[in-house]
Amino acid sequence: MAIQPWRKGKVIKIDDHTHNTRRFWIEVAELERFDFIPGQFVTLDLPIHEKVNKRWRSYSIASWPDGSNVFELLIVLAEGGLGTAYLFNEITVGSELTFRGAQGVFTLPGTIEKDIFLICTGTGIAPFRSMVNYL
């Protein structure tokens, strides 16, 4: 799988799901359609450290492919987490984020011939939400 290029996305909507959980909708204006497979993730490059590789934070895509250029992230505020603190305190509607993806292989098989069980906790539901809504 080829490494995806870094892209710019604009936050077009933010929803406080709970006191420490937010949904962020990100539009990729340079693309007519943002393609991904349910279960994949994006990596954000956040300005939280001077070393590049310490700025990267990966989050599963919570939305499902709908043919648009918008995707959704479901993020919980982690105590002491630099990335989530930045997202919760600095990012507003209209903010620009740098990201890479979609990437990852935690996806459904091409053909499902048996019942599948999806087990998770907390915001670990994000990739499963994408999968279930896609099915």
Can you annotate each of these PLM segments?
Residues 2-5, 51, 80-135:
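FNR/FR-type flavoprotein reductase catalytic core
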Residues 2-95:
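Ferredoxin-reductase
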